[in-house]
């Protein structure tokens, strides 16, 4: 019985994702996605002319540079975008 219990515990630990996974909002904030490995930033992209209306949100590995037309805001905590 102890062997079976130990086996179940080991299988559970191996199957679980024990690493930290970041969660980022999608375009509509109540919905979010779990970022893939290596994507350790959340981002929000919006047009400079309309800064209150995000155009795109998601996970990214490196924060892109903003331009005259498009601005990116990046962060590294769950659902911070």
UniProtKB/Swiss-Prot annotation:
Disulfide bonds: 24-42, 35-59, 63-74, 75-80
Subcellular location: Secreted; Target cell membrane
TM helices/strands, residue ranges: none
Tissue: Expressed by the venom gland.
UniProt GO cellular component terms: extracellular region; membrane; other organism cell membrane
Signal peptide: 1-21
Coiled coil regions, renumbered to chain: none
Superkingdom of source: Eukaryota
Protein purpose: Basic protein that bind to cell membrane and depolarizes cardiomyocytes. This cytotoxin also shows lytic activities, on many other cells including red blood cells. Interaction with sulfatides in the cell membrane induces pore formation and cell internalization and is responsible for cytotoxicity in cardiomyocytes. It targets the mitochondrial membrane and induces mitochondrial swelling and fragmentation. Inhibits protein kinases C. It binds to the integrin alpha-V/beta-3 with a moderate affinity.
Subunit structure: Monomer in solution; Homodimer and oligomer in the presence of negatively charged lipids forming a pore with a size ranging between 20 and 30 Angstroms.
Family recorded in the similarity comment: Belongs to the three-finger toxin family. Short-chain subfamily. Type IA cytotoxin sub-subfamily.
Protein name: Cytotoxin 6
């Amino acid at each position: 019985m102890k062997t079976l219990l130990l086996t179940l515990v080991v299988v559970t630990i191996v199957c679980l994702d024990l690493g930290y996974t970041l969660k980022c909002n999608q375009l509509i904030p109540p919905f979010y996605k779990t970022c893939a490995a290596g994507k350790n930033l959340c981002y929000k992209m919006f047009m400079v002319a309309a800064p209150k209306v995000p155009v795109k949100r998601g996970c990214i590995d490196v924060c892109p540079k903003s331009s005259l037309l498009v601005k990116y805001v990046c962060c590294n905590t769950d659902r911070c975008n």
